[in-house]
């Protein structure tokens, strides 16, 4: 069977940036990596209702800067910024360094693979039919401006005895094209029949930045043929 490489991992440094951007010596690398994992785990559990897509961590000058990408910034910030201050203190304690929290709003959650996958998973937990949830997500993404989307669910769909997977695709999803901007993410739905896995691929277009501009060569005009007999 053919296996698929992770769409985000293969594009790191080409069209996708890393979600942890810092440099450390050998002595500090392991502790920083573990600290990143602890911070992400804490924030994901704390902000389950905030529609968090990703958490980007930077470490400038013996401090930590966390950028939370969310579709509901008001839930993260809280009344008069009180919740952000609580998060900042907790992150600073976990990392052991001064912390700064930034909030980035996601304007189009229908085009974010993580948010789409979480939405489908939540609908499955509310006993919405999986085909309806998949089709609704695909239609919303294409309506907002996606060039292609694929959604796959796996598990005991509809309470069936035998687990299976079903997928639905619309538009193009070119996984082999490295310049293709493909957002990929997964989620899990915990139902009474077991865990159902959700995968989402969203193709937003091709990234051409950094490539040399293609200049079309002027077409050479062919000389006009003289009419016969002259």
From Swiss-Prot:
Kindly state a single biological-process term from the GO annotations of this entry.
translation
Q: Name one GO molecular function term.
A: structural constituent of ribosome
UniProt keyword rRNA-binding present: yes
Record-linked Gene3D superfamilies: 3.30.300.20, Ribosomal protein S3, C-terminal domain
**Protein's UniProt name:** Small ribosomal subunit protein uS3
State the UniProt keywords alphabetically.
Ribonucleoprotein, Ribosomal protein, RNA-binding, rRNA-binding
* Role according to the record: Binds the lower part of the 30S subunit head. Binds mRNA in the 70S ribosome, positioning it for translation.
Q: Where is it found, in Gene Ontology cellular component terms? A: cytosolic small ribosomal subunit
Cross-referenced SUPFAM superfamilies: Prokaryotic type KH domain (KH-domain type II), Ribosomal protein S3 C-terminal domain
């Amino acid at each position: 069977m053919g296996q698929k490489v992770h769409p985000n991992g293969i594009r790191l440094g080409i069209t996708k940036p890393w979600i942890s951007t810092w440099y450390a010596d050998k002595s500090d690398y392991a502790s920083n990596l573990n600290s990143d994992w602890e911070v992400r785990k804490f924030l994901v559990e704390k902000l389950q209702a905030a529609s968090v897509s990703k958490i980007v961590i930077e470490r400038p000058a013996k401090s930590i800067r966390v950028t939370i990408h969310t579709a509901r910034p008001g839930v993260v910030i809280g009344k008069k910024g009180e919740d952000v201050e609580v998060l900042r203190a907790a992150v600073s304690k976990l990392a052991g360094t001064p912390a700064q929290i930034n909030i980035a709003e996601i304007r189009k959650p229908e085009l974010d693979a993580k948010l789409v996958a979480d939405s489908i998973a939540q609908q499955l937990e509310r006993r919405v039919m999986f085909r309806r949830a998949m089709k609704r997500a695909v239609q919303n993404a294409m309506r907002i401006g996606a060039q292609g989307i694929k959604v796959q669910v796996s598990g005991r769909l509809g309470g069936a005895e035998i687990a299976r997977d079903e997928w639905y695709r619309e538009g193009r999803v070119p996984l082999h094209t490295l310049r293709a901007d493909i957002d990929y993410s997964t989620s899990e739905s915990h139902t009474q029949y077991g865990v159902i896995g959700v995968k989402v691929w969203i193709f937003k277009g091709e990234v051409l930045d950094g490539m040399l501009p293609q200049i079309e060569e002027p077409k050479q005009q062919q000389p006009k043929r003289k009419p016969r007999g002259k």
